[in-house]
Amino acid sequence: MSDFRVPCGAAETEFTEKRSRFIGHLLPVETEEQAREFIAQMKKKYYDARHNCWCYLIGSDILRYGDDGEPQGTAGQPMLNVFRRENVTNVVCVVTRYFGGILLGAGGLTRAYSKSARDALAAAGVAEMGLRSEERR
């Protein structure tokens, strides 16, 4: 038997770090198409934001992320790492940043995007799922 975890539902969280506003959105998904559609919806909704960074994991094989103009490795990858550490799959997360005028630096960006993903996951909740072998006798 192999276990995995999935988000219980959609979630939205928000916090401010040095005047930059971070809005985290999380949604359970089952296909890459659903994930890409959600990312497109968030980019359209927050068209005036400086950055709409995203990541998704589907099953054990499909994982993607995007930094949307933030320095490489400071947004999408740290968000993805949150879900990998928690063994969560079938999830898409978009974090929108409205720049507040104060540079956060690479470490500050990494911490802020990770926090936003963690907060959204905590707000959504997580369900344990199991795959059972059909070899019962």
PLM features: residue spans?
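C-terminal regulatory domains involved in ligand/effector binding and gene-expression control
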Residues: 1-73
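Solvent-exposed alpha-helical segments within well-ordered globular domains of core cellular machineries
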Residues: 33-40, 44, 81, 111, ...
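Short, flexible loop/turn motifs enriched in small residues
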Residues: 48-50, 85-88
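Conserved mixed alpha/beta catalytic, RNA-binding, or beta-rich assembly cores of soluble enzyme
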Residues: 72, 76-84, 109-113
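Conserved phosphate/anionic-ligand binding catalytic regions in large, soluble enzymes, centered on
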Residues: 101-102, 106-109
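Long, charge-dense
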Residues: 106, 113-132
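Conserved small/polar residues in nucleotide/adenosyl-binding loops
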Residues: 135-136
